[in-house]
Amino acid sequence: MTGFLDRMAAASRMRLEEAHAREPVATLRARAFATPLPPPLLLRDRFNLIAEFKRRSPSLGRLGDADIVPRVTAYAQGGAAAVSVLTEPSQFHGSLEHLATAAATLAAFGVPVMRKDFLVDPYQLYEARAAGAGGALLIVRMLSREALTEMTDCARELGMFVVVEAFDAADIERATAGIRRGCPLASPELHAPLGDTHRHLGRGTPAALLGVNCRDLQTLEVMPHRFAELADALPRELPCVAESGITTPDDCAEVARDGYEVVLVGSALMQAPDPAGVIRTMLAAGRAAA
């Protein structure tokens, strides 16, 4: 790991210990499974967008004080396939309360929320599910082979999708192997019962996606050229997400041509006066290029 991820992992483990002291895992797990099943992630038309809510970015600083309910409502109205919500408190000013508010707001739109944080333990997936989340981000560099398998197994048990995040070709190889071990692959022939926590699984309703983050973890600068450089390493059986540095419709068109089916957009939408309009324009550009 890098220094930034080391610090984030250490802070995450400290919060995990505090959470364990407040609520035993057995109680939390029961609460998670008692929470109504969230909407599934539905990918349409060859190119999709995950919109992100965060109050702060380590590289850009504070992103404003937008109220979460109208902001995520605009994301859904613009056509976002899912909404990513930061829950990390120190660097991103996020919380589980933000996640729960977004989930409650978006249920009426049929749009799932995903927990974005520096997750290191299944307990944190139970927290997310109990807050109403339908998905979560897993960072492959923060997890051992065994831990990644444990996390993907837990997510599958909870009926949650995962975005497994990579930063380079070696990460992509590890992430893809971990997804293959822990999640059914996104195949049109693959189905699961709809009557329990499992999903109808196909490429349009994936259990797992591969995320590629173009941020340099030493400097926190974005390096968009990495999307093209890593395109040949992308697994064709998984939907792939371009993360960080996506700010314009042209960016969406470019990564769509490189083979990415999804973009995750955060800061640009948090700063936009009309986020729904920005999402529509980005989706149109990506779908025209895909």
Whereabouts are the PLM-identified features?
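An N-cap/entry alpha-helix motif that binds or orients negatively charged groups
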Residues: 1-66
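Catalytic cores of alpha/beta
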Residues: 120-132, 168-183, 236, 242, ...
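N-terminal active-site wall of soluble small-molecule enzyme domains
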Residues: 48, 53, 59-163, 169-174, ...
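Catalytic alpha/beta core domains of metabolic enzymes, predominantly
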Residues: 183-208, 216-218, 223-250, 266
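Glycine-rich phosphate-binding active-site loops on the catalytic face of alpha/beta enzymes
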Residues: 81, 85-87, 130-147, 209-219, ...
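Conserved, mostly hydrophobic/aromatic
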Residues: 8, 51, 75, 128, ...
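C-terminal helical cap(s) of enzyme catalytic domains, especially alpha/beta-barrels
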Residues: 230-233, 256, 269-290
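Glycine-enriched alpha-helix->loop->beta-strand junction motifs that scaffold or abut catalytic
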Residues: 79-80, 105-109, 130-136, 156-161, ...
